[in-house]
UniProtKB/Swiss-Prot annotation:
InterPro entries: Dimethylallyltransferase, IPT, P-loop_NTPase. This is tRNA dimethylallyltransferase. Monomer. The lineage of its organism: Bacteria, Pseudomonadati, Pseudomonadota, Alphaproteobacteria, Rickettsiales. It comes from the Bacteria. Its EC number is 2.5.1.75.
């Protein structure tokens, strides 16, 4: 390894990334940098399975649980913060280990990103309020009137992309698609990325997904989301996509029993994990894939990663 090397430990939710990354950081003088879009937020460490205090007491962690849920966050903002932290870590002659499953962040960090102009806070607030008032379908119809191309590429149920495309057009007068076709900008072109993709066998992955959600529900996620619901208006947490939030809110509103909410969250987590695996397989080409089908094989992964990543 050199001071220009970065390890990215990626994979689906509940694949064991956090444990493996923590153990690597302890063994090889590393520091952990978050590359998960939901773990950046304050007040939801349980539902997002953020690193526990026992981990942060042993290893230095960056970009976890620092952002208010009312604040807007974008891939460009993430990249700037991540680049700063990576340079700080390497300046201390330590190994940056990025852990997460947000494909857009990983892809943009490694292969470059589309620099879309920032949206003013006033306009952002206006669009959020409009969405709260009229909902996805009507907002999609408004987007189609302004930007037919973008609307044709966005599912009406994809709230985040829908709002993003609408506000970009209002801010710039241009389709978000016009920015996405420009040459990509590289933020860390002089660094070497070593991407380790954890790919558990599907049956084992689904088992760990179910166990993860069961543990989260039992260890405080319901109280965590109840507090969010009490302290903030729904429009303030529209961008919180962590699996389990929607189901817990339904339980708190009396629309689901607790058992049904847990079951629904487990199903959605398995579906999300499956999509993540497909995305990483298809979108990240230059990577090392590590497969395992049970706990015993997973335990051996820690012995394999150093050689695959070139850690000495």
């Amino acid at each position: 390894m050199t001071t220009k090397d970065i390890i990215i430990l990626c994979g689906p939710t509940a694949s064991g990334k956090s444990y493996l990354g923590h153990e690597l950081a302890k063994a090889y003088n590393g520091e952990i940098i978050n590359i998960d879009s939901m773990q950046v937020y304050k007040k939801i460490p349980i539902i997002t399975a953020s690193p526990p205090q026992s981990y942060t007491a042993e290893v230095t962690y960056h970009l976890y649980n620092f952002l208010s849920i009312t604040e807007d966050f974008s891939v460009v903002k993430y990249l700037k913060l991540a680049a700063e932290k990576i340079k700080e870590v390497t300046a201390r002659v330590k190994l940056p280990i990025l852990i997460g499953g947000t494909g857009l962040y990983i892809n943009s960090l490694v292969f470059g990103y589309n620099n879309i102009p920032d949206i003013s806070e006033d306009l952002r607030e206006q669009v959020r309020n409009l969405h709260t008032e009229i909902g996805n379908i009507e907002l999609w119809n408004k987007l189609e009137e302004l930007d037919t191309l973008a609307a044709s590429k966005i599912n009406k149920n994809d709230t985040q992309r829908l709002i993003r495309a609408y506000e970009v057009f209002l801010e710039t007068g241009k389709s978000i698609c016009s920015f996405q076709t420009l040459p990509k900008e590289q933020i860390l072109s002089d660094f070497n990325f070593k991407i380790i993709f954890l790919n558990p066998e599907r049956k084992f992955l689904y088992k760990t997904c179910d166990e993860r959600l069961d543990k989260i529900f039992k260890e405080g996620a319901i109280d965590e989301i109840a507090l969010i619901k009490k302290q903030f208006a729904p429009k303030d947490y529209v961008d919180l996509k962590a699996v389990g939030i929607k189901e817990i809110l339904a339980y708190l509103d009396g629309d689901m029993t607790l058992d049904r909410a847990l079951n629904a969250a487990q199903i959605r987590t398995r579906q999300y994990a499956k999509r993540q695996v497909t995305w990483f397989k298809n979108q990240i080409q230059d990577k090392t894939t590590l497969e395992y089908s049970n706990q015993e094989e997973f335990a051996q992964i820690l012995n394999v990663i150093p050689a695959e990543a070139g850690i000495h």
